[in-house]
Design a protein with these regions (language model features):
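Short hydrophobic alpha-helices and adjacent helix-cap/hinge residues
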Residues: 2-191
């Protein structure tokens, strides 16, 4: 059942990435991150937001946008803005901000590789704040992060820490949790 949901989730990500790229298919190289990798990862961020429920008090008003922040050096560039332009999550527009330090108002925080040495500190500061934390740094979940993106022989994948998500007051869809590599392959997620 989880494999069927994963197939649907990956298909949704690839369709979103294809529309943004103007291509009928996306080849995700495994060697080094490239623009296509980040196009797919941007689509993952969008889909993560669709499968997370934030408490009402996380937003200033009922119509406030969902704010996706990138902390540190931004590996996405314009790809993130292009992917999210015009998209909605639970009826909310999506706003993108780039930050040098954590600031209030973020709902989803992508922590870039330039922040590697501060991961444990950052996740500790955000431990009980309703901010979905995502990074592609190895060991992010073990440092207290919620979703860790990685690329393996099967393409872009993710691990999730349901306890970290719950502790922050967010609710992750059971479907999202079931799609995570570490939930489908409990021996560690990465293959």
């Amino acid at each position: 059942m989880a494999d069927r949901f994963m197939l649907g989730f990956v298909a949704a990500v690839l369709v979103a990435a294809s529309v943004v790229a103007g291509a009928s298919s996306i080849r995700v190289p495994r060697e080094q991150p490239r623009a296509d990798d980040y196009r797919v990862k941007a689509a993952f961020l969008y889909n993560f937001a669709k499968f997370i429920e934030w408490p009402a008090q996380a937003f200033a008003t009922p119509s406030a946008p969902l704010t996706l922040c990138v902390l540190g050096v931004d590996p996405f560039g314009a790809v993130l803005d292009d992917t999210l332009r015009g998209q909605l999550v639970a009826g909310r527009t999506i706003s993108v901000r780039r930050l040098a330090q954590v600031e209030p108002g973020c709902h989803l925080l992508f922590i870039g590789g330039s922040e590697r040495s501060r991961l444990a500190l950052l996740t500790g500061q955000l431990r009980r704040v309703s901010v979905l934390t995502v990074s592609e740094e190895p060991g992010f979940n073990e440092s207290g992060g919620m979703i860790e993106l990685f690329t393996d022989r099967d393409g872009v994948q993710f691990n999730i820490s349901p306890k970290a998500v719950e502790r922050s007051g967010l609710r992750a869809s059971a479907r999202l949790i079931a799609l995570a590599a570490n939930q489908r392959h409990p021996s560690g997620g990465r293959r």
